[in-house]
Design a protein with these regions (language model features):
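Class I S-adenosyl-L-methionine-dependent methyltransferase catalytic core
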Residues: 1-217
Length: 217
């Protein structure tokens, strides 16, 4: 197997994992209404160059993978996001997108080595905290009443453990795959404001009046 890193000097890669984004200096402006927060090779997209979406991943690389079903016995895996960034620290303003797709790595053991890890990524270290931060960031950049589509495969970790990492309540979902292990779950960001300091007495919720300036949720 050969591996070649894809280097593009015109693209900003300093927001890779472990390097915090300074949003006061470097926020990416976008006209896209859809965010794929960890796009990988964009496997489930009908149009992998859809102009309505912006694609983010922490990796930019190319791999040649063995594939007996392909002509020549191999195929190319290309991970080439629009922005190189980590989903725990997204370089976009609050309330930017109408729809966010969140499909994080789901393998902790089986994908640690080999082509599975290259294709899907792997969970490392304190992955529960990583996913908790990922949910929080995806909801931050999502507009009020915007939709978040979350995808998770239960090959190793039950989806119930993952849903416990966000305070947001899912609307509905669907199972897919031969063994019905892949979950597609839909959330909607509430159109509310929270007033008062966190953990300082009861939290007051109120509906945001139509046309009112958006704030951080």
């Amino acid at each position: 197997m050969t591996t070649a890193q894809m280097n593009d000097p015109e693209r900003d890669g300093s927001a890779a994992v472990g390097i915090p984004v300074d949003r006061t200096v470097r926020l990416h402006a976008t006209d896209a209404s859809v965010l794929d927060a960890c796009c990988g090779s964009r496997m489930f997209w009908f149009d992998r160059a859809d102009s309505r979406a912006v694609f983010v991943d922490r990796r930019r690389e190319r791999h040649t993978l063995p594939d007996v079903s392909s002509k020549g016995g191999s195929r190319e895996l290309v991970i080439d996001p629009d922005h190189l960034a980590d989903f725990t620290d997204l370089p976009f303003a609050t309330d930017t997108f109408a729809l966010v797709v969140f499909d994080p790595p789901h393998f902790e053991r089986n994908g640690a080595t080999g082509w599975v890890g290259l294709k899907y990524g792997t969970l490392k270290g304190d992955w529960q905290e990583m996913l908790r931060l990922g949910f929080a960031e995806c909801f931050r950049v999502l507009r009020p009443e915007g939709v978040l589509i979350f995808k998770w495969c239960e090959d190793e970790i039950p989806v119930s453990r993952i849903l416990a990492l966000t305070q947001h309540k899912p609307l509905f979902g669907h199972k897919s795959g031969k063994q019905q292990k892949t979950h597609w779950i839909t959330f909607m960001k509430p159109n509310v404001l929270v007033t008062g300091p966190p953990k300082a007495g009861p939290v007051e919720w109120r509906v945001r009046p139509h046309g009112e300036q958006r704030g951080n949720l």
